């Protein structure tokens, strides 16, 4: 699904799946409460002011029908934006950005995603090569794809973005 999120232009630079409507703006503002809860290490008891001005704990913030924050200690939270399976954060953000989004803005958005993970309380989990804007060319199951999609050029001289079609879906 091409619905945008926090780093990919939701509301402020809509793609073909989003409209930049007032309802999307309100949803993004409400979703910022989740981001605040996650930056605090997912602490269930952490008190903060929501976008609506209410003072709540992280456990009172809804994330898809469950509490956004649930930990007693930030060390209980693993923070990540992408992992070893499925697309990299670079791949998925390329898919979700509006077509005309400049490369420099896409890179900044990817850096924001990585920065949130690194600066939030908790344990950061960084997918190998994320700092190099690593791509697996949208391969959702690269385990069976071999080195073509899984190798990392640590020099940063090459990229796998858009370098061939991913395997057929499982």
Spans of features found by a protein language model:
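Loop/helix patches that line or flank the sugar-binding groove of alpha-linked glycan CAZymes
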Residues: 58-170
């Amino acid at each position: 699904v091409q619905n945008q999120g926090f780093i990919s232009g939701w509301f402020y630079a809509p793609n073909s799946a989003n409209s930049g409507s007032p309802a999307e703006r309100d949803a993004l503002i409400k979703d910022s409460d989740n981001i605040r809860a996650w930056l605090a290490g997912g602490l269930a008891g952490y008190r903060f002011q929501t976008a609506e001005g209410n003072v709540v704990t992280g456990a009172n913030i809804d994330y898809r029908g469950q509490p956004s924050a649930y930990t007693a200690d930030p060390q209980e939270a693993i923070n990540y934006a992408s992992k070893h399976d499925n697309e990299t954060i670079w791949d998925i953000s390329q898919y979700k950005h509006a077509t005309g989004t400049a490369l420099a803005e896409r890179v900044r958005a990817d850096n924001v995603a990585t920065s949130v993970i690194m600066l939030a309380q908790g344990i950061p989990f960084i997918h190998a090569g994320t700092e190099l804007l690593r791509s697996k060319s949208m391969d959702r199951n690269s385990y069976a794809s071999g080195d073509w999609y899984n190798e990392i050029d640590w020099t940063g001289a090459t990229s796998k973005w858009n370098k061939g079609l991913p395997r057929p879906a499982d």
